[in-house]
């Protein structure tokens, strides 16, 4: 079940404030955030947001196709290093 339409989308206040001030000044720089649950809104298009993956901040350049999705969807949190290889020795 999705979020109620009357509530609107969730965007962290501090993130939205930073985006709006940068838009008013026509300034582009990387914004660090830990808010993976924030929804991408049209004001964010063209900005680079560094989203935390649990270890480091990874840059995400926001495009039109990303609007409506969450920031955390574009930053993987787990690293798959492959399955264990076959044991070369036979069991005796």
Swiss-Prot record:
PROSITE patterns: RIBOSOMAL_S19. Keywords: Ribonucleoprotein, Ribosomal protein, RNA-binding, rRNA-binding. GO terms for cellular component: cytoplasm; small ribosomal subunit. InterPro entries: Ribosomal_uS19, Ribosomal_uS19_bac-type, Ribosomal_uS19_CS, Ribosomal_uS19_SF. It holds the Pfam family Ribosomal_S19. The keyword 4Fe-4S does not apply. Gene3D superfamilies: 30s Ribosomal Protein S19, Chain A (3.30.860.10). GO terms for molecular function: rRNA binding; structural constituent of ribosome. Signal peptide: none annotated. One of its GO terms (biological process) is ribosomal small subunit assembly. Protein S19 forms a complex with S13 that binds strongly to the 16S ribosomal RNA. HAMAP family: Ribosomal_uS19 (MF_00531). Belongs to the universal ribosomal protein uS19 family. This is Small ribosomal subunit protein uS19. It comes from Gloeobacter violaceus (strain ATCC 29082 / PCC 7421). The lineage of its organism: Bacteria, Bacillati, Cyanobacteriota, Cyanophyceae, Gloeobacterales.
